[in-house]
Amino acid sequence: MAANPSGQGFQNKNRVAILAELDKEKRKLLMQNQSSTNHPGASIALSRPALNKDFRDHAEQQHIAAQQKAALQHAHAHSSGYFITQDSAFGNLILPVLPRLDPE
């Protein structure tokens, strides 16, 4: 039941190597950013992250739409109520529709 110290050491070395690689990449990106701000013709490189962000936003919206559809189908299959998809400040994918009954 003793922990395997060699396996733990390997994991730590792996983590250190990953962190070092990330730090090196970060420094490289910072250097590229500094050089592009010094040269006005290098603004093309700055527009690419915006394109990637738009692509990520679109992919995220498609993922949310798929989740909403799945939640809506599940709710309709397992409940006698009626539900709609609606953006919610509380993160709900679907909301129940409750009928208003006139007081008698």
UniProtKB/Swiss-Prot annotation:
The modification N-acetylalanine is found at A2. The keyword DNA repair applies. Keywords: Acetylation, DNA damage, DNA repair, Nucleus. GO terms for cellular component: nucleoplasm; nucleus; SOSS complex. It is found in: Nucleus. Its main location: nucleus. It holds the Pfam family SOSSC. GO terms for biological process: DNA damage response; DNA repair; response to ionizing radiation. Component of the SOSS complex, a multiprotein complex that functions downstream of the MRN complex to promote DNA repair and G2/M checkpoint. The SOSS complex associates with single-stranded DNA at DNA lesions and influences diverse endpoints in the cellular DNA damage response including cell-cycle checkpoint activation, recombinational repair and maintenance of genomic stability. Required for efficient homologous recombination-dependent repair of double-strand breaks (DSBs) and ATM-dependent signaling pathways. Belongs to the SOSS-C family. Component of the SOSS complex, composed of SOSS-B (SOSS-B1/NABP2 or SOSS-B2/NABP1), SOSS-A/INTS3 and SOSS-C/INIP. SOSS complexes containing SOSS-B1/NABP2 are more abundant than complexes containing SOSS-B2/NABP1. Interacts with INTS3; the interaction is direct. This is SOSS complex subunit C. The gene is INIP.
